[in-house]
């Protein structure tokens, strides 16, 4: 069916047909091809991105920033290019996401720095943490305040205490680590 077919269908079914005013004409566009679908997805992405920029979030390249409607972002957060924010992700205030980030169902506190190329799912990061570059957080991970997870570090169901550092080349799986601990390179838990 085409969107315009709705009028004839409604009349055949003896339904009431009336004109309505829409504030955003993009909401009434039909999708009849893959090209139309891509245009509509861009329209929706632009609308969501505009909402966040008006709320005080900086998007360095809105054309490559993908934010789902369910995401929440704190004021004065800066989001770099090629970032995908999905699901129930909540990002605090004054965070910096350098770019090429894929976040799904994340809870991120204030003043967190996510360096280039991070993948994160179903985890929590407390205030002031620094993550990446090239870090991977898998479900069930909780990073305390001021934790540093460096390059090529992966964590799964890891509970990492405040101030702890795993600077590079480390796997933290199914583990609880106390505060102010330094994890050496090449560590596998």
Describe every region a protein language model picked out.
Residues 1-64, 69-71, 76:
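Terminal amphipathic alpha-helical/low-complexity segments used for targeting or macromolecular assembly
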Residues 58-189:
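Structural signal for interior beta-strand "rungs" in well-ordered beta-sheet cores
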């Amino acid at each position: 069916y085409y969107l315009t077919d709705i009028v004839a269908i409604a009349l055949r079914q003896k339904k009431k047909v009336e004109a309505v005013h829409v504030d955003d004409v993009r909401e009434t566009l039909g999708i009849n091809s893959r090209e139309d679908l891509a245009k509509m997805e861009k329209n929706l992405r632009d609308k969501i991105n505009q909402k966040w920029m008006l709320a005080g979030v900086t998007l360095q390249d809105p054309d490559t920033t993908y934010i789902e409607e369910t995401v929440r972002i704190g004021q004065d957060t800066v989001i770099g290019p090629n970032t995908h924010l999905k699901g129930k992700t909540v990002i605090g205030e004054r965070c910096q996401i350098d770019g090429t980030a894929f976040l799904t169902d994340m809870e991120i506190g204030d003043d967190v720095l996510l360096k280039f190329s991070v993948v994160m799912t179903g985890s929590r990061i407390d205030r002031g943490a620094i993550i990446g570059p090239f870090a991977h957080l898998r479900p069930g991970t909780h990073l305390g305040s001021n934790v540093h997870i460096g390059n090529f570090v992966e964590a799964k169901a890891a509970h990492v205490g405040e101030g702890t550092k795993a600077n590079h080349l480390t796997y933290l799986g199914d583990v609880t680590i106390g505060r102010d601990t330094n994890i050496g390179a090449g560590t596998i838990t």
